[in-house]
Amino acid sequence: LLYMYNMKKVTLFATGIIMMSCAQQQQKLTYPETAKVDTVDVYFGTEVPDPYRWLENDTSAATAAWVEAQNKVTNDYLSKIPFRDALLKRLTDVANYEKIGTPFKKHGKYYFYKNDGLQNQSVLYVQDSLDGEPRVFLDPNKLSDDGTVALTGIYFSNNGKYTGYTIARSGSDWQEIYVMDTETGKLLDDHIEWAKFTGATWQGDGFYYSAYDAPVKGKEFSNVNENHKIYYHKMGTPQSQDKLVYQNQAYPKRFYTASVNEDETILFLYESGDGRGNALYMKDLRKPNAPFVAMATDMDYTYAPIEVIGDKIY
């Protein structure tokens, strides 16, 4: 009897939601008109119309007005859903619990990410020992007023002196690299822009990173990204002085990233984009002007170094 009673309550609740949903669906939605423009590309002799390309210009006044009109239609509809506030409250209650990531050890200290419950971004903590007192190492929530700057990577220099970190703003693929003093937490002047699909690989008094040329102003999110490059940034110098380490203009759509072994003697280059895996190259940093030497050139498999011991790479 109790089971039947509970099932009856569930059925009535579900029926109520369905009835309210049907009432919502009866509302007539009048969508704003979307202008069409005469834009045509020709590919191998075939004309391909693209009448809505003007919407790719996400910084134009016309696009902003279109988005505002679309949002008004959406928000007017959603605001009339009677159980919306109750649903939001329930989802908020369910998500509001402490979340702690797996700790990792670097230079004798322990780091971990923690979210108190409803924070936009998880905070990186550090403690001196396993039973030490945790303290905030880097709080990405303080990197913007609205909490939309995400910490996408953390990179400690091999000597522990510097900590590089990458951020992304508002969900963008573009990344920026910042560096701080590991001991004091002081943010240093080194700042890299227009990085993408990259980390910061330390070697000596600087690091390698991957980036594209700066896009045309106003087209930061619509420009085609081509010619991915690897640079070396020396600490204390502006990005304009960074050394170009590798590019391959014969394959403008491919991606290039780098890593360095623990002894900082070998620079590894990963090339991807044409298959499921990556090609792998190496460069001996002990030899001035040494070239990159191919280790594996097909991209059907994933290749990565395990260790460098003497003159052998595993």
Locations of regions flagged by a protein language model:
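Positively charged n-region of N-terminal signal peptides that target proteins for export
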Residues: 2-10
